[in-house]
Amino acid sequence: MSKREEGGVNSNDKILLVTSNENKFREIFEVAKSHGIKIEWLNIPKFEIQADNLEEIVRYSAITIYQVVRKPLIVEDSGLFINALNGFPGPYTNYVRRKLGLEGILKLLNGVEDRSAYFKTVMCYVSDKEINLFTGVVTGRISERIKGEKGFGFDPIFIPENEERTFAEMSTEEKNKYSHRAKAFISFLNYYLSERKT
């Protein structure tokens, strides 16, 4: 997929998605396409701040980038929150994945009975008229070992509720039935499409 790619069927419904992660774009691309919405991928790094909550991080990033591109856009950030670790790594998920990796998280949970966790995505939509946040959450548990070769990030160790497979063992379509990212984007779409009808 190129740095700027579109999907969907209605040329009047096009949204700029800011991310340097192609996997995230692919997930949202599939959801948008199924709703007849066009997504344009702006492949640039986010302007991030160190903060203790995802809402503050994405709001800052979205506003900062909007001031440059001056087009309606979405910025998203996601975190893995492990209950036995008091919500760690949370908003520091990307940093922890790079430093500890999947094995590092599994070692932290070695011998821990409570493996419950959740993924949370927060999306910020910015236009010349508004700034809105949309959230998606999926509950589940951390697996005992790394499983699956699909997906990205912590997908190989996260099993959503009512499933036995990790996200990394699912296709994008299967993952989107549970995905925190898909839920957040659908929440945005419901708002966006209802606003266009008024």
Enumerate the predicted regions with their spans.
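Anionic-ligand binding patches
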Residues: 7-16, 23-198
